[in-house]
């Protein structure tokens, strides 16, 4: 079978970047970077726009993972972004640039860095690091973060049902996980299970070739179709040292989960950058009544609203990232930023879909793809509703959780 990236690119694909017009980084956040990081970001953007983006709609339509694009991402250092010593703003702008071309790819790189590699490097044993860190950094191995369960999503901290039982010099892990990104293609899974001895939620490193690990692809999704989400069943025996030594209580993971929630806010920024790319390009190329769509006031109003949503999201994310660097970011900030950015991304995608008319329903014009993908980021890493409850509790001192 011919790799998707080797197949011809359809002529109908719109150019992402419109030369001579303002960059979709409307607030010029990249100007805050040091020159070396700015040059690196420009190189990453160029690779994503010219070597990656033209192929992604076909992967999305086919519900296939883009394995043949990983070597190029590894060459750019995206497999070890969280460990390379770059500035926080640079890392977040990279996440936005990846989301600008595709949210599945962004989810893979983000979860890979923020959760899988980040947790093994930060919470793992020396043996676990030696076994997995190098392979993950080069994308020679992929990881899966196994927390959500079939019956427990928003209530996972209190309701997690997967169990870990110590049996001599082994751990026995039994349970089920759902919606696990890369679950069918990962080489290693970080599995969260409740210790039957003390009731604490603990992390375990589980090679996916371990007998009793079974992953089934979730098909028919309306969004994140490139990401291979999976149902996972576990009935495995692991050596005693499979436990993550820095993750023997769920509290140990909260800071990483908080930071990953903020990262999803940057996905919302990137998605809106992609929306503006496609909407502006289409409005300039598409002719109606012998004029480009961009010459009509209603279309310009939609473009301006998308731009405002994007700028508002980017400005919020910049300040929240600043608070994080200063050690002052609280869960309220991460929840508010994630909820707001993804809500505005949803609105921006809908505005662009309307402007494209019937063509907006076709994935070849990309907006339909972005709309579906945005629905996923609106819901994962804390649904919109749950994040608003976190913010409301922080602002009023009253919990509305039931």
Roles of regions detected by a PLM:
Residues 136-139, 269, 273-276, 303-313, ...:
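Alpha-helical transition-metal enzyme core signature, strongest for iron centers
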């Amino acid at each position: 079978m011919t790799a998707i990236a080797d197949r011809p690119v359809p002529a109908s694909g719109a150019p992402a970047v419109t030369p001579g017009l303002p960059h979709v980084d409307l607030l010029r956040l990249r100007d805050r970077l040091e020159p070396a990081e700015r040059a690196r970001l420009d190189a990453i953007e160029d690779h994503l726009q010219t070597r990656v983006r033209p192929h992604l709609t076909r992967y999305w339509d086919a519900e296939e993972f883009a394995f043949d694009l990983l070597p190029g991402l590894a060459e750019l250092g995206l497999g070890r972004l969280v460990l390379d010593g770059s500035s926080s703003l640079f890392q977040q702008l990279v996440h936005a640039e990846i989301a600008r071309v595709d949210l599945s790819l962004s989810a893979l790189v983000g979860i890979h860095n923020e959760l899988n590699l980040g947790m093994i490097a930060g919470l793992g044993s020396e043996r676990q690091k030696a076994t997995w860190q190098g392979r993950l950094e080069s994308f020679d191995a992929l990881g899966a973060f196994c927390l959500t369960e079939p019956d427990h999503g928003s209530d996972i901290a209190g309701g997690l049902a997967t169990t870990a039982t110590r049996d001599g010099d082994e751990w026995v892990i039994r349970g089920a996980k759902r919606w696990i990104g890369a679950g069918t293609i990962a080489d290693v899974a970080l599995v969260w299970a409740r210790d039957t001895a003390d009731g604490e939620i603990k992390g375990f490193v589980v090679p996916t070739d371990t007998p009793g690990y079974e992953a089934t692809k979730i098909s028919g999704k309306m969004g994140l179709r490139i990401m291979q989400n999976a149902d996972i069943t576990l009935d495995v025996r692991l050596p005693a040292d499979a436990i993550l030594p820095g993750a023997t209580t769920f509290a140990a993971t909260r800071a990483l989960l908080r930071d990953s929630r903020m990262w999803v806010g940057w996905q919302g920024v990137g998605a809106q950058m992609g929306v503006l790319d496609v909407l502006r390009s289409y409005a300039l190329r598409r002719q109606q009544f012998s004029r480009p769509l961009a010459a009509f006031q209603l279309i310009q109003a939609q473009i301006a609203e998308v731009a405002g949503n994007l700028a508002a999201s980017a400005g919020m994310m910049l300040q929240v990232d600043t608070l994080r660097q200063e050690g002052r970011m609280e869960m309220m900030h991460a929840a508010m930023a994630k909820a707001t950015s993804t809500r505005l991304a949803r609105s921006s995608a809908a505005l662009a879909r309307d402007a494209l008319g019937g063509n907006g329903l076709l994935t070849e014009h990309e907006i339909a793809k972005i709309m579906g993908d945005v629905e996923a980021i609106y819901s994962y890493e804390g649904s919109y509703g749950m994040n608003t409850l976190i913010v409301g509790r922080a602002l009023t001192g009253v919990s509305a959780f039931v």
